[in-house]
Amino acid sequence: MTMKPNPMVILTGPTAVGKTALSIALAKKINGAIISADSMQVYKYMDIGSAKIMPEEMDGVRHYLVDELDPSDEFHVVRFVEMAKQALKEITANGQIPIVVGGTGFYIQALLYDIDFTEQECDSAYRRQLEELAETRGNHYLHEMLKAVDPASAEAIHENNRKRVIRALEFYHESGERISEHNERESQKTSPYNFAYFVLNDDREKLYRRIDVRVDAMVKAGLVDEVARLQQMGCHADMVSMQGLGYKEILAYLNGTSTLEEAIYIIKRESRHFAKRQLTWFHRERDVIWLNKPDFEYDDTKILTYMMDVLQAKGILPRSE
């Protein structure tokens, strides 16, 4: 079979499932470079809480979108797609295969199907009006406004996520169309890539145990000191970076609003909830190939062999003679 253009390999799955080690082994086997689809690993100085891959673990494999932004920078889906597309160009120009690795399904979907989430020109007067309403009447009032015009968006966006609530109201105000309908239409696009979309998974109880072990290891490795250093650098709870799982809870402890034991308990609980939401997302996605670790007897070599067969069948890799 001839090789097809625009190859892309995706390796995702819930938090703590073991994506990192498998991604390195895969990259070395297929001459790949890795694009991180993680909303936290892109930030410098945020290593422990994001479970960031360290240079010595990379084993010579080039990683993009790791350690590229300051914690004060905003990182969102539009910026991710911009940066990831630039990385894709570099990787293919180097004759390598891009491997998108990470657990942020929304980012992966946007890149894979080239979904348009770019900001349109907005009516800043209307935005100011909404911001004033939020200040005077509260987030709940704004969220009720959204529920009246776009119930699906109101269902998907938490009322405390004021920025996204305002964006959805703005979109409706400017276009007369619900942003939920726009996003749904965009998500039905076909992909411009020849891709293989792998989701690594494990038994739920084992996954939850791994999450607990990982959180304990993070605390032992110095998570509290890491967050304290970030605080000294001027990082605060309103920054996108500091709203990440593990950071906001330790920040609450440092600010005296919880004990360390409570913070650790909440991180573990919220990490389990996050893993559950990730799996729900991946089950809804099209064309995914599940890699259930028990089916491969927890042997990464067997998983890799299966992945190689899939990549050859899809024309992403040449068939071995």
Where are these regions (language model features)?
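Phosphate/pyrophosphate-binding catalytic cores of soluble transferases and nucleic-acid-acting enzymes
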Residues: M1-E321
